[in-house]
Amino acid sequence: MTDYRKILKQYWGYDNFRGIQEDIIRSIGEGRDTLGLMPTGGGKSITFQVPALAQEGLCLVITPLIALMKDQVRNLRERGIKATAIYSGMTREEIVIALENCIFGNYKFLYVSPERLDTEIFQIKLRSMHVSLITVDESHCISQWGYDFRPAYLKIADIRQLLPGVPVIALTATATPEVVSDIQQRLQFRQENVFRMSFERKNLAYVVRHTEDKESELLHILQRVDGSGIVYTRNRKKTKEISQFLNRNHITATFYHAGLNDETKDSRQKAWLKGEFRVMVATNAFGMGIDKPDVRVVIHADVPDSPEAYFQEAGRAGRDGMKAYAVLLFCARDKITLKQRVSDTFPEKSHIRKIYEDINFYYQMAMGDGRGCTFAFNIDEFCRNFKHFPVQTDSALKILTRAGYLEYTDEQDNASRIMFTITKEELYRIREQSEDTEKLLRILLRSYTGLFTDYAYISEDNLSTRSGLSKQQIYETLLSLSRQHILHYIPAKKTPYIIYTRERQETERIYLSKEVYEDRKESYVQRINAMIEYAESENRCRSRMLLRYFGEKNEHNCGQCDVCLQQHQSGLKSGEFEAISQQLQALLKENPLSLQEIKDKIQVPENQLMKVVSYLVSEEIIRQENGYLKF
């Protein structure tokens, strides 16, 4: 019997597996197609990395998350495990080298974005690889019912035909019962085989705060809850504004979004992980693959557009098992904003076709041409030229991607990378280099492994710090070495891409199927409504609401969300408490009242009334001043 724990100890230093990890690993070891449902922080990567290391051959990992892909490749290499990745934005030379290494270089892991599966070069090279396991991360993306459906995932079934007999492990942190069934069907599971880790987080208290002054409420929460925190907002500009607001109020904070360059994002992430900043204010670009177990509070200043997204982001709190809070700030306008997102996310079909037509004009693409062509895409410039709105343009391009006409990648930061183009022996024989160049070469060789066989990501900032040379000197020296054909240097580049997956079509022939458009729009509306229901509910346990959404039955209330605490503290049934609370708040909105005046107006037992008053005062929903209660 394979000793999986020995592998776990050797490479990760752990003595035992957690939760259902070992059950999933043994299922894969037996050659069975396996679906693992594990919440954020459940240790998904262990479930495919350990069995892959236990057998001969290569593990093919399909994931849409480029940042996570790079992070896992780096972590595996640091453990002495050969791993590489292929994704949009790489040069053809880089892709060929990575694929050749997987055929001849005894590599254990090849990470690939789903869009690469359909390329001719990938499918040719794949036939020569000894693949022992296919891993499908974020597997909900294969389901049209999932909140992040990606048509490229449907190509995985074709890959299974090229690799008959190779088992597949599908992983996701968020899947409704409908999606669970769809994943297994679309991945052609030989038989149903699902392992579920409970999505219940017993140490995490879910809270909704209804407020029209989110900044003050945010500050109030962070002053009452100690420890590290994350504040999520949908707007890049607001990440900076909220961060500045917190710093002005003596709470150390920094901000993070996809528009920042790689170096800035990396340095801020590391500073927050080390505790140099207490709070990270971010868009949803932050958090995937982040390992910080002691986050005490995650606050959503804006409402996510699906329970899946909310559950995943909120779940970054309390991974150490200690008490933590997930707080959603909700105001009257949020409901209107959520409804508006439907038209932003699903523009009219005529508008989508118009954007396709304008894209063709933008790139001067002739009818019948374009298949396989890749272009950098500046969405702001495009929208200025053709009078479109960026949000709807982004959505239209994603729908055209799902329909198979284009491949559109959001902004992605491709860090600088290098690879030596001569052998190590030839490098040592080179003379007549400057002292600075010699110094930089020595640091490169000490800092990065595998530079003679594969491209490695480098940081000019880190090289500058270690060498004492300026960042500009590092850049110029690497360019000089590249011109001398000693190494190949690809400077960092930050840009989205558009790739024509088909020849240019006549605009009126662009077909957006019911599955691609109407069904997905309906599903999106249902998720929006589920979030509104969650935020507005005042009498149902929030943990049970989330678990029920994901198909997990739970007969007991959590006892720690704001709804449960309200009911417990009052000793009233939820309906009774809510009726008194609403009546009291309605009276106080009209005029401040003394306690005696309230007793005269609300005819309920005094002990019940006082419990409601005490709770509303403690939660700062109402306040007491000079003998009067005020809203």
Protein language model annotation of sequence segments:
Residues 277, 295, 299, 303-312, ...:
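C-terminal accessory region of SF2 helicases/translocases
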Residues 60-61:
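Gly/serine-rich nucleotide phosphate-binding loop at the start of the catalytic core
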